[in-house]
Amino acid sequence: MARDYPLDRYRNFGIMAHIDAGKTTCSERILYYTGKSHNIGEVHDGAATMDWMEQEQERGITITSAATTTFWERTEDGETADTPKHRLNIIDTPGHVDFTIEVERSLAVLDGAVCVLDANAGVEPQTETVWRQADRYKVPRIVFVNKMDKIGADFFNCVHMIEDRTGARAVPVAIPIGSENELEGLVDLVTMQEWVYKGDDLGASWVKGEIRDSLKDVCEEWRGKMIEAAVEEDDDAMMEYLEGNEPDVPTLRALLRKGTLALHFVPVLGGSAFKNKGVQPLLNAVIDYLPSPLDVVDYMGFAPGDENEERNIPRRADDDMPFSGLAFKIMNDPFVGSLTFTRIYSGTMNKGDTVLNSTKGKKERIGRMMMMHSNNREEIEEAFAGDIIALAGLKDTTTGDTLCDVKEPVVLETMTFPDPVIEIAVEPKTKNDQEKMSQGLARLAAEDPSFRVETDIESGQTIMKGMGELHLDILVDRLKREFKVEANIGAPQVAYRETIGHEVEHTYTHKKQSGGSGQFAEVKLVISPTEPGEGYSFESKIVGGAVPKEYIPGVEKGIKSVMDSGPLAGFPVIDFKVALVDGKFHDVDSSVLAFEIAARMGMREGMKKAGAKLLEPVMKVEVVTPEEYTGGIIGDLTSRRGQVTGQEPRGNAVAINAFVPLANMFGYINTLRSMSSGRAQFTMQFDHYDPVPANISQEIQEKFA
């Protein structure tokens, strides 16, 4: 079966933004105008099509990136006949910091992105975080300045903020007409026409016309800047322009596309998704400026089992290449069970095929294949390069795994997931729910690699670990709704770590004589701190056989056994290195086990000598507040052992930046609300580990020892 849409008419893109910038509303409108959604869902009614998990609808924030396929016929200048439809695969990504991992996962499979800004707030902290992630994955993007109908909306301020905050060059291609209550439509700077929305058909129709006199000067000025950016992409166009000839509309679009794909600049449009103004021009811009799978450089993978991960196997969007795809999201669907969202990079896949999961080295059979529309699904028989589809019934595949042709194995990606910074104990309210809870938690952990479940060996409690309070709140909530488990949760605990203060040399002798063969081993260890974030390393410097080779793995095993439980309060030990420099052995009484015990005991004693210290996670906090509350908020952050690093004006508010220990941030949202009458908001994310002050360290040791 041939593909319905040629690859140059595919657009795989994500919609990314800060929480509350109106991202889900934008996705909704896109689905409405492209005919995939028959009624408009409003986020503040809790009925948006993309937000299909119940809690997302209740909290009005997007948590999981639902992938949706829809189609758009480019609305051409003056006529719509004969313009081929494009196939849009949209990934809706969350904007809350606790879900940054979701954004990372979706960026790994996108070709382009639409960044949605709030016209009043501009570039907010989470926008910067997501922008940096998109830079890392080299994702071309366009910006939609949304909420132009809001009080205080300022399109040009947002354009300057993009340049100040992200360092990108912002090039407006469409300017809003009016703002706040007087938003009428926009001016397309490429064609120099007004689009004015009239009537109450939810923005489905508009009138195009000449630019009004009051806007001509500002439009000419910004069009000049746009053309200057465009002609820099092509020497001939630049020469023509310097001779006084402007490029025609198709040439201008082609040059703007070239610059966007090369990440030289970012096209910017304005409008209001909620008021249904400016969404069709945004869709046109997606087609004009964002990449198709053919515009993306070859994806370089490596051979399974290659320890150096030498990326020398190319895969590109071509149906004739061997099949390869990346599983980027697992979701539980109440009707179909587990769904694996997969981006196909090369080749084709048919129902019934057997493919290789090259990350795990296991084969999977393709049962049901679906094209997803938010939470409706369409069964398909075949999928092609460039498609984003959902597969049901895969047994061993998790987020970040590569699926590929059995005969042509390749690994596309190794996704790294951050360590959790917060944990809570959880137990079912009734004993009967224990098994249901365990199954539910295992499923949630399969969906979300930044969430971990462990059992505390000493207390037997089940521990949930995640990226923030909201993250764990929502998971506990999902246990209740999807798995019908009522759970009691303990107070949140901080994920402390331990490390050492200075280098020591320590010798430990292990002797045991109790009739028969005894145990003997002596090790001399040098234990040293490393730079923060460098982790652990072990080196044997034994010369002349002071410790026979076969016993050295025992030494390393003994050292590693101490890493999970440090000498101060039993927390994992990080950022240190150990060298085995000398030792003694006995021909009869020495064994691997004896050396393991000697190393373990030597480490415990040596670390205490090395000035073991407790480390705590420190969060980067940003509070955005009306000016009158700044004094109180700064005082409160300082009282939480926070270090305020600066403040700056943000629109008509003030942004306060600080580093605060996570231990002092629990329940902060309630304090902030009461201090600012609900008008301030904050974001925080893990930044680094810092030593805990001595008096507090003592309390923690007494509590956990």
Swiss-Prot record:
GO molecular function list: GTP binding; GTPase activity; translation elongation factor activity
SMART domains: EFG_C, EFG_IV
InterPro entries: EF-G-like_DII, EFG_II, EFG_III, EFG_III/V, EFG_IV, EFG_V, EFG_V-like, G_TR_CS
Record: residues binding GTP: 17-24, 92-96, 146-149
Subcellular location per the Swiss-Prot or TrEMBL entry: Cytoplasm
Record flagged with keyword Nucleotide-binding: yes
Alphabetical list of PROSITE patterns matching this protein: G_TR_1, G_TR_2
Superkingdom of source: Bacteria
Coiled-coil regions, chain positions: none
Keyword Cytoplasm set for record: yes
SUPFAM superfamilies per UniProt: EF-G C-terminal domain-like (SSF54980), P-loop containing nucleoside triphosphate hydrolases (SSF52540), Ribosomal protein S5 domain 2-like (SSF54211), Translation proteins (SSF50447)
Gene3D superfamilies recorded: 3.30.230.10, 3.30.70.240, Elongation Factor G (Translational Gtpase), domain 3, P-loop containing nucleotide triphosphate hydrolases, Translation factors
One cellular component term from this protein's GO annotations in UniProt: cytoplasm
Pfam families per the UniProt record, alphabetical: EF-G_D2 (PF22042), EFG_C (PF00679), EFG_III (PF14492), EFG_IV (PF03764), GTP_EFTU (PF00009)
Domain spans labelled tr-type G: 8-294
Any one GO BP annotation for this protein: ribosome disassembly
Family annotation (CDD domains): EF-G, EFG_III, EFG_mtEFG1_IV, EFG_mtEFG_C, EFG_mtEFG_II
Keyword terms of this UniProt record: Cytoplasm, Elongation factor, GTP-binding, Nucleotide-binding, Protein biosynthesis
Family recorded in the similarity comment: Belongs to the TRAFAC class translation factor GTPase superfamily. Classic translation factor GTPase family. EF-G/EF-2 subfamily.
Role: Catalyzes the GTP-dependent ribosomal translocation step during translation elongation. During this step, the ribosome changes from the pre-translocational (PRE) to the post-translocational (POST) state as the newly formed A-site-bound peptidyl-tRNA and P-site-bound deacylated tRNA move to the P and E sites, respectively. Catalyzes the coordinated movement of the two tRNA molecules, the mRNA and conformational changes in the ribosome.
Listed name of the protein: Elongation factor G
Organism field: Dinoroseobacter shibae (strain DSM 16493 / NCIMB 14021 / DFL 12)
Taxonomic lineage of the native organism: Bacteria, Pseudomonadati, Pseudomonadota, Alphaproteobacteria, Rhodobacterales
